[in-house]
Amino acid sequence: MWQIMPAYDSLDAAREGFAWELPDDYNPAVDFVRKHDPERTALIAEADDGTVSTHSYGDLDRRSDRLAAALSGLGIDPGDRVAVVVPQKPANPIAHLANWKLGAVSVPLTVLFGPEALEYRLADSGAKAVVADPGVRDDIDAVRESCPALDHVIELGDSAAGEAHAFEALASASEPGFESHASTPETPSAIMYTSGSTGPPKGVLHSHALWLGRAAAAYNYFDQEVAEATLWTPADWAWGAALGGTLFAGFHYGATVLAWPREEFDPEAVFERMARHDVTHSFLPPTALRMLMGVDDPADRYDLSLETLAAAGEP
């Protein structure tokens, strides 16, 4: 089983010894879900109402197969842009995996965006379809006329109002076994937008190799213990460090990832979830880390399995 394994004792040793040797036919969808035991747990998902579901690598493979076939049936072709505006829910990776199996380019967007931010990015990227959480459906409908390329809205759930398609219907309609689009490490994979601090946000087109760079980084900042880990980050899966450095890095190594779409950061609730789901490795924004440090005696009050915390975003 091929994996990026940059195991070195020092940065100098890594600089001397490491070289990128990527498969010529690399496709992240195949890498993330088809090389692992299909019964291995990929996701533990806790919903807004507290219900918990588990999703194996085989589950994600089959559902993304079906969604890829459905997207193809809607006229999505290789190279087309498909936006994903979904929080930490199983539909998020399923949508990205389906895009890459089809050869489409993902446009990860956060559910925290308002209508103007969504309008700019959907129009600028030329998104032909958007997979959207119900919480952003009204905003997308409000700006759809300003996004001339946007032919399809796919709303999470069993049903969708108006002209939108229901995600669950598409992700269960076809048979699994979709033949993935032939790709290489240089095949366009995702458009990710800059923050816009020096002007309008800029869409940066990344190739499939992006995810391997993120995996290599995670392998080191999670102390080379990724494969048997349970990973979690509070960051939205639209951001690079969360999507690539936690979710898909975990999938590359066959880890388990916790999906928990909370609206606010409650440090007591975070420790409780970490204990409940046996989280071993977590990537935290510095603000979140400081809030956790303000909790009294968490190791005594919670049965934690934490081994490694990583943080980035501030000096």
Question: How would you describe each model-predicted region?
Answer:
Residues 87, 132-141, 260-262, 279-315:
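Adenylate-forming
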Residues 1-55, 59-72, 149, 159, ...:
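N-lobe entry segment of adenylate-forming
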Residues 61-69, 185, 204-224, 289-294:
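Conserved structural elements of the adenylate-forming
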